Amino acid sequence: MPIKKPCLKLNLDSLNVVRSEIPQMLSANERLKNNFNILYNQIRQYPAYYFKVASNVPTYSDICQSFSVMYQGFQIVNHSGDVFIHACRENPQSKGDFVGDKFHISIAREQVPLAFQILSGLLFSEDSPIDKWKITDMNRVSQQSRVGIGAQFTLYVKSDQECSQYSALLLHKIRQFIMCLESNLLRSKIAPGEYPASDVRPEDWKYVSYRNELRSDRDGSERQEQMLREEPFYRLMIE
């Protein structure tokens, strides 16, 4: 006689967790958007920041002729196969990730060496919030190259918090740093270069422009420009 087995039904309802109750992994950009108002208000509570200007910095000719050398805690690397000279702080101040935010500085081609001389004290400053930057070796680019007529300097911004987030203090320092770069160039009457079509900038920036390289491309478009102008990082720099 067959054994009658009890009818067992597994209740799956208890295993189905409502999706909205699961903390979703937000992107760094979404987190920055969510914290925008808080950061905006915190930034405005900080006083003006004054950067100590580095002394004994190299000239543009020095870094063009060097292969690998250390200046003011920055390793300068100039490979013959690269049109850029790279600078990277040996002991980074920002320990977070690079999430695509960067600035370009565009200078008239013939004034790039002079612009470097004007900005080098800030770029090599121990107070600089920029751990990594690069500059075009003008001897290696054509007359009409994108990084010859503009965008000769690139400043890479790294986050300093968990989940690739920026602290209000770092954002404040970056804002102030960009203002100092702009004012030094303007005061020295340096001629601006052609800023990249891929970037955005407010009307009062004459040399510096912004781009997030993870959410844009070099070609640029109206749609990309609008998107970049809505980037929370960019808005926190200009508003």
From Swiss-Prot:
Mutation effect (residue 102 to R): Loss of Erk2 phosphothreonine lyase activity. No effect in binding ability to erk. Deficient in down-regulating MAPK signaling
Name used for this protein in its record: Phosphothreonine lyase OspF
Effect of residue 175 to A: No change in Erk2 phosphothreonine lyase activity
Localisation per UniProt entry: Secreted
Signal peptide feature range: none
Main localization of the protein described in the UniProt heading: secreted
Any single GO CC term annotated in Swiss-Prot or TrEMBL for this entry: extracellular region
Effect of substituting residue 134 to A: Loss of Erk2 phosphothreonine lyase activity. No effect in binding ability to erk. Deficient in down-regulating MAPK signaling
Secreted recorded as keyword: yes
High-level lineage: Bacteria, Pseudomonadati, Pseudomonadota, Gammaproteobacteria, Enterobacterales
Record's keyword terms, sorted: Lyase, Plasmid, Secreted, Virulence
Stated regulation of activity: Inhibited by the tyrosine phosphatase inhibitor vanadate.
Annotated phenotype, changing residue 131 to A: No change in Erk2 phosphothreonine lyase activity
Native species: Shigella flexneri
UniProt cross-references to InterPro entries, sorted A to Z: OspF/SpvC, OspF/SpvC_sf
